[in-house]
C-alpha cells in the first residue's frame, strides 16, 4: 500500500527508462535491505487521466536491470493496454 500512496502523491517520481516509451522505474526498499538493495518497480503513468499501471517488479539482487527483451515485452504490453 505504501507504493500506491507514494505514486498517487508523486506519479512522476520514477525515472524514465531509456527506450521504454514512457515506462518509469522506481526503487523501493525491501525489508532489511534499504533502497539500493531493494526492489525495482516498473510502471506507466498516463497524466491526462491520472492512471498508473504497475507492470513489473523485481529484486535488484536477482536482476540488476531489465533485459532488452523484457523492456521490449513490457513496452508492447503497455501499448496494447492503452490503445
Model segments located where?
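Short, hydrophobic/aromatic-rich beta-strand segments within well-structured domains
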Residues: 38-47, 51-57
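Basic, Lys/Arg-enriched alpha-helical interface segments
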Residues: 1-35, 48-49, 59, 63-83
